[in-house]
């Protein structure tokens, strides 16, 4: 039903225009102090949306999130000491 989503961080000159970003995706978070918004959209449309957003006059820059491309399954480098001892 839902496709893969990816976030992009949109840095703004002014937060006055932050509501306009709703047309381009789901707004997850808006930082008032640092003047950025985290916007989610489909992975297939991310490049197209970034080009559209770059044309807007109130957008400083856009960064794409690389979280979908990172490995999130970690291996333990040290074995657990409690499992080494046999208490039976």
From Swiss-Prot:
One of its GO terms (cellular component) is cytoplasm. Keywords: Cytoplasm. The keyword Cytoplasm applies. InterPro entries: DUF2129 (IPR016979). Pfam families: DUF2129. Signal peptide: none annotated. It is found in: Cytoplasm. Transmembrane segments: none annotated. Belongs to the UPF0298 family. This is UPF0298 protein BA_4142/GBAA_4142/BAS3844.
């Amino acid at each position: 039903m839902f496709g893969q989503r990816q976030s992009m961080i949109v840095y703004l000159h002014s937060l006055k225009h932050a509501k306009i970003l709703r047309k381009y995706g789901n707004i997850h978070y808006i930082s008032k102090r640092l003047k950025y918004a985290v916007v989610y959209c489909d992975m297939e449309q991310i490049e197209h949306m970034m080009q559209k957003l770059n044309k807007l006059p109130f957008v400083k820059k856009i960064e794409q999130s690389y979280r979908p491309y990172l490995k999130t399954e970690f291996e333990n480098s040290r074995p657990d000491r409690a499992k080494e001892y046999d208490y039976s």
